[in-house]
């Protein structure tokens, strides 16, 4: 009886182990950690230009003047754990200095921000091993759409949240709103990763695979924020070694860890489809055998 149960358990877990082995093989072949390091470097180079472009967009729309402040706090609180306040002060100071630049300098900021979009595009298509290239004009249009519409959609969602919060006319509705707002960062991360894995690759990505990969990445991202903040609080080795400059290596490590999570979600999305194809091919061979 015990042997039968063990055989059934082994039979059921065999596909999972096969999928995990395939996932690890793809991570190793794609040099995922190296890609994450490259993206982290470009992200740090593009951080101030990207924030400057985003805040300039909000300044162009007076209706988002109040929301832009909330969006700043939301970004730094949810995407830069533990040291968000310090980094926010420095970045806002850098952005204020960038406002004094000439038109040529402003164009340079936009190009640097678009460089990050190109690097993300290149890294994800490397993971999907796509050989097909988009037309340059189309790629530029996609990058510009993400750069402009992304912050505006985030601002609109925060504006809706700000409108819903004061509603106290229904206790049941108030409970629902509180629960939705509590999981809002997770939902936003999930949707963002799903769009990233669905739109950026130049080949068709099955929607269910993108949803699963994005959900895993969102969970890891939210857990990573809490774990990273806890680590910085409980083990302040960076503060002891670097002192007031500790914010720099902390930011480096967090950006690198974030890109590892993003690329891991992409690897999971790809592996789900590849494993399904391999399984179907194996079943087809078994059916063809006499």
Swiss-Prot record:
It is found in: Cell inner membrane. One of its GO terms (cellular component) is plasma membrane. The keyword Transferase does not apply. It is a multi-pass membrane protein. The chain crosses the membrane at residues 44-64, 104-124, 140-160, 183-203, 210-230, 244-264. Disulfide bonds: none annotated. Residues 1-43, 125-139, 204-209, 265-290 are cytoplasmic. Keywords: Cell inner membrane, Cell membrane, Membrane, Transmembrane, Transmembrane helix. The keyword Lipid metabolism does not apply. Residues 65-103, 161-182, 231-243 are periplasmic. Belongs to the UPF0761 family. NCBIfam families: PRK01637.1, yihY_not_rbn. This is UPF0761 membrane protein YihY. It comes from Shigella flexneri.
């Amino acid at each position: 009886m015990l042997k039968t149960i063990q055989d059934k358990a082994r039979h059921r877990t065999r596909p999972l182990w096969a999928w995990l082995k395939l996932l690890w093989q793809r991570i190793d072949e794609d040099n995922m950690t190296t890609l994450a390091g490259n993206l982290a470097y470009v992200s740090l180079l593009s951080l101030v230009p990207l924030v400057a472009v985003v805040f300039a967009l909000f300044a162009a729309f007076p209706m988002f003047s109040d929301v832009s402040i909330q969006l700043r706090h939301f970004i730094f609180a949810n995407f830069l754990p533990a040291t968000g306040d310090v980094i926010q002060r420095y970045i806002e100071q850098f952005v204020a200095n960038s406002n004094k630049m000439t038109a040529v300098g402003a164009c340079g900021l936009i190009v640097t921000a678009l460089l990050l979009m190109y690097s993300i595009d290149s890294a994800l298509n490397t993971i999907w091993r796509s050989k097909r290239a988009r037309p340059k004009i189309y790629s530029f249009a996609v990058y510009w759409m993400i750069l402009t519409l992304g912050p505006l959609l985030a601002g609109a969602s925060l504006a809706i949240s700000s409108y819903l919060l004061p509603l106290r006319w229904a206790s049941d509705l108030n409970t629902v709103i509180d629960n939705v707002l509590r999981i809002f960062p997770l939902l936003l991360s999930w949707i963002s990763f799903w769009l990233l894995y669905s739109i950026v690759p130049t080949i068709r990505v099955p929607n269910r695979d993108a949803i699963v990969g994005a959900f895993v990445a969102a969970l890891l991202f939210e857990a990573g924020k809490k774990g990273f903040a806890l680590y910085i609080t409980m083990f302040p080795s960076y503060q002891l070694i670097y002192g007031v400059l500790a914010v720099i290596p902390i930011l480096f490590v967090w950006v690198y860890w974030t890109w590892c999570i993003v690329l891991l979600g992409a690897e999971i999305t790809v592996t789900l489809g590849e494993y399904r194809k391999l399984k179907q091919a194996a079943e087809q061979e078994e059916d063809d055998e006499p």
